[in-house]
Amino acid sequence: MQIFPAIDLKNGQCVRLFQGDFSKKTVVNEDPIAQAKAFATDGATYLHIVDLDGALEGRPINLEIIQRMKKAAKIPVQVGGGIRSMAQVDYYLESGIDRVIIGSAALTDPDFLRAAVQKYGAKIVAGIDAKNGFVATRGWLDVSQVSYLDLAKRMEKVGVETIIYTDISRDGTLTGPNLEQMANLKEHVKVSLIASGGVSSRADLEALAQLGLYGAIAGKALYNHDISMSDIVEVEQIAY
């Protein structure tokens, strides 16, 4: 299973949120470039970067910093946050970013998602963020009436190969991932699934790996030292 250390960017710093609440923000490193390099040095093979400023503004804000992070880390990066037009997708991918995550627009503008997948294939990842099973958009500020499973099925139909699923109620809480929802997704869609939200321990990563998922994202637990990079490297190499 591929495990992605997460770096969330706000005002040029690495931060963690609690349940996606921008008022409950903790700065975990003032230097995101050093953080990216440290993760890579300790064995990370792929980084998950979210431009929180971009998610709020609806346009990429931190591309220059992200480019410098990738250059320092020398490993692939996937980036999300405010990517809502083909021009923005082009902007990221032409600048050397490996994959882009389309979140809100996957629900609000399915034609854009379809066009992006047709143009870039596996470089497009769909992000589904849900609260109590219903999809949230616009930096998690708005909650729709669309269920996470219905949206995942729509994503599969338009050709999306990889979906990141975030349970907002668990994000940044260290209460464990939503194994039930991940298992439900695994049963009903045949895309590569990445779990996000709530990972608190090596045991959580092992439980996700046992579901047969493609990947998992580790954030707060890494910064709190509840999970080490050596844990991540070891779990990635276990065959379930």
Swiss-Prot record:
Enumerate the InterPro entries for this protein.
Answer: Aldolase_TIM (IPR013785), His_biosynth (IPR006062), HisA_bact_arch (IPR006063), Isoase_HisA-like (IPR044524), Isoase_HisA-like_bact (IPR023016), RibuloseP-bd_barrel (IPR011060)
Name the pathway: Amino-acid biosynthesis; L-histidine biosynthesis; L-histidine from 5-phospho-alpha-D-ribose 1-diphosphate: step 4/9
Which reactions fall under this protein's catalytic activity? 1-(5-phospho-beta-D-ribosyl)-5-[(5-phospho-beta-D-ribosylamino)methylideneamino]imidazole-4-carboxamide = 5-[(5-phospho-1-deoxy-D-ribulos-1-ylimino)methylamino]-1-(5-phospho-beta-D-ribosyl)imidazole-4-carboxamide
- Under the cellular component aspect of Gene Ontology, which terms does the record hold? cytoplasm
Write down the superkingdom of origin.
Answer: Bacteria
Question: What enzyme category does the UniProt record give?
Answer: isomerase
Q: Which GO terms describe its molecular function?
A: 1-(5-phosphoribosyl)-5-[(5-phosphoribosylamino)methylideneamino]imidazole-4-carboxamide isomerase activity
Descriptive protein name: 1-(5-phosphoribosyl)-5-[(5-phosphoribosylamino)methylideneamino] imidazole-4-carboxamide isomerase
